[in-house]
């Protein structure tokens, strides 16, 4: 596993341990690896807690040590059973609140339901609902990483520190891709062009954007709402009004804006889940002359058949961080590589507990990062 260790963090972390408790809210042992890494870096023991499912599938949490007057950090990595994971977190937060914890900080590297942060058709903004539930349960602070949309921070009425994984991914490119200076950074849709531009500018590389039929459906901003069918006897609008309507969208044939011929193509995005759009992008880049294709993403959800499809595709390597456990997927697909980001989460916890500034973790980060 690739790990970045800045020189200033190589020594043992200076942390006041007396008032800090570190919990993992996961009942699934495979989801506790990140928590263990963070605890080891901080030099503290994991707090004693039992999280389990009753025979009737209800979640039960039993905290087995005092949290009164302490800073409680609850680490929750998202498993495949996302709804159970959320309930585990909410119940543990509420248990700490009713046990008189001084502060309750959620460490949620991948914020669930973040894709549902926009209104579509007659749906709802689920990430806003989840933010309200967390605050109501008793969360006083949130540490997360690379939110799908930065505006999600505004859904909370508590402080939110949205850390970035890009420094770790950039260093991976520089150290693990020998000929990276012959690479081009690729956005698989116009929606991810800003992220690609940020990577390209920092690596002093060119950029290419894929536009057309291979676009991800999320880039379509149409909300999709339609009125109920008209009653024939009732006019839709007053006959004297002429309201202009939007012309329907029509995606052009697939196009790559930028030169990728004879180069390494590095596709960057924040989430890799359903891989169809990545596979289509890889095929297009191969047709345009790219001789090697990498995919870099912060959150590797890699749902359903994603590992098998990646293994059979034109993609040479997929690099994701360990915000979400994916050890099983790595066994299915050797092309998947992991970058460890426990270092930055540990440092964020240390700084918040010690009352230090968080600005060090956000230096050189712009609005588009």
UniProtKB/Swiss-Prot annotation:
This is Phosphoribosyl pyrophosphate synthase-associated protein 2. One of its GO terms (biological process) is purine nucleotide biosynthetic process. One of its GO terms (molecular function) is ATP binding. It comes from Pongo abelii. InterPro entries: Pribosyltran_N, PRibTrfase_dom, PRTase-like, Rib-P_diPkinase. The keyword Acetylation applies. PANTHER family: PHOSPHORIBOSYL PYROPHOSPHATE SYNTHASE-ASSOCIATED PROTEIN 2, RIBOSE-PHOSPHATE DIPHOSPHOKINASE FAMILY MEMBER. The modification N-acetylmethionine is found at residue 1. Belongs to the ribose-phosphate pyrophosphokinase family. It comes from the Eukaryota.
């Amino acid at each position: 596993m690739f790990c970045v260790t800045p020189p200033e963090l190589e020594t043992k972390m200076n942390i006041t341990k007396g008032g800090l408790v570190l919990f993992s809210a996961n009942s699934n042992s495979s989801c506790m690896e990140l928590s263990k890494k963070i605890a080891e870096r901080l030099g503290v023991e994991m707090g004693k807690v039992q999280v389990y499912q009753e025979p009737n599938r209800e979640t039960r949490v039993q905290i087995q040590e005092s949290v009164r007057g302490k800073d409680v950090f609850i680490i929750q990595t998202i498993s495949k059973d996302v709804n159970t994971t959320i309930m585990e977190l909410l119940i543990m937060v509420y248990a700490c609140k009713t046990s008189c914890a001084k502060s309750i900080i959620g460490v949620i590297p991948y914020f669930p339901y973040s894709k549902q942060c926009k209104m579509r058709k007659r749906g709802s903004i689920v990430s806003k609902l989840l933010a309200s539930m967390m605050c109501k349960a008793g969360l006083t602070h949130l540490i997360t990483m690379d939110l799908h949309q930065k505006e999600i921070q505004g859904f909370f009425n508590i402080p939110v520190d949205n850390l970035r994984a890009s420094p770790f991914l950039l260093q991976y490119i520089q150290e693990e891709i020998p000929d990276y200076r012959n690479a081009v950074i690729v956005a698989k849709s116009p929606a991810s062009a800003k992220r690609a531009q940020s990577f390209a500018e920092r690596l002093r590389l060119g950029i290419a954007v894929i536009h057309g039929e291979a676009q991800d459906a999320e880039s379509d901003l149409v909300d999709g709402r339609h009125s109920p069918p008209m009653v024939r006897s009732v006019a839709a609008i007053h006959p004297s009004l002429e309201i202009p309507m939007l012309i329907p969208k029509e995606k052009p044939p697939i196009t790559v804006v930028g030169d990728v011929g004879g180069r390494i193509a590095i596709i960057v995005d924040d989430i890799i889940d359903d891989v169809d759009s990545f596979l289509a992008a890889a095929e297009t880049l191969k047709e345009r002359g790219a001789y090697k294709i990498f995919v870099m993403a912060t959150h590797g959800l890699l749902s359903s058949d994603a590992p098998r499809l990646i293994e059979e595709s034109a993609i040479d390597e997929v690099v994701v961080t360990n915000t979400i456990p994916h050890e099983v997927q790595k066994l299915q697909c050797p092309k998947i590589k992991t970058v460890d980001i426990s270092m930055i989460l540990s440092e964020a916890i240390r700084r918040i507990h010690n009352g230090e500034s968080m600005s060090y973790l956000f230096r050189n980060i712009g609005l588009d990062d």
